[in-house]
A protein has these predicted regions:
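Membrane-interface extramembranous regions
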Residues: 2-152
Length: 152
C-alpha cells in the first residue's frame, strides 16, 4: 500500500524550503480566515463566547506553528511543527464539519449551511496542509530540515 501511495518512489521533489514555506503559508491562511470571522461577524450579530475562544486559539496556534516551520533554526522544532500543524488542521476540519452538521447554541444560522465562505476557506487551507504533510510523510516532498542526496 505504501508503494502505491508513494507513487513507487518515481515521483519526488527536493524543494525543502519551498514545501516548508507553503506549509507555513497554508497555516497563516487558516489563521487569516479566523481573523476575518472575528473582525466581521460581531458587526452582524454577537458571536458566542466559545467560537471567539476557539478562533483565538486557532489563530495563535496557526501563527506559532507557522513561525516554527518558517523560522525554526532547530531541525527538531520544524519537524514537530509539522505534526502540530496536522493536529491543528484536523481540529479545524472537525469543528468546521461539526458546526455545519450539529446544532450549536447561538449558531443556528450555521447549521446546514455549506456556503459560509470563511469556513470553506479554512477547511480548504487545513485540508491542503494535511495533504502536503502527507506527501512529506510519503517521501514525495521533502520538508526542511530533511534533504535528498540524489545523484544522477
Amino acid at each position: 500500500m505504501f508503494r502505491v501511495l508513494s507513487l513507487g518512489g518515481y515521483v519526488a521533489f527536493d524543494l525543502p524550503r519551498v514545501v516548508t514555506g507553503l506549509g507555513a503559508i497554508l497555516l497563516v491562511g487558516v489563521a487569516a480566515t479566523h481573523v476575518y470571522v472575528l473582525a466581521t461577524q460581531p458587526a452582524q450579530g454577537a458571536l458566542p463566547w466559545y467560537l471567539a475562544v476557539y478562533a483565538a486559539a486557532v489563530i495563535a496556534g496557526c501563527l506559532l506553528v507557522g513561525l516554527a516551520l518558517w523560522v525554526g533554526r532547530n531541525p527538531h522544532v520544524a519537524q514537530v511543527g509539522w505534526y502540530f500543524g496536522s493536529l491543528l488542521s484536523v481540529v479545524v476540519i472537525g469543528v468546521d464539519l461539526l458546526t455545519r452538521v450539529v446544532y450549536l447554541p447561538a449558531l443556528t444560522g450555521m447549521t446546514g449551511r455549506w456556503d459560509f465562505a470563511p469556513a470553506s476557506f479554512a477547511f480548504a487551507f487545513a485540508g491542503a496542509f494535511l495533504a502536503l504533510h502527507t506527501t512529506v510523510l510519503l517521501g514525495i516532498n521533502v520538508a526542511y530540515p530533511q534533504r535528498q542526496l540524489w545523484e544522477d
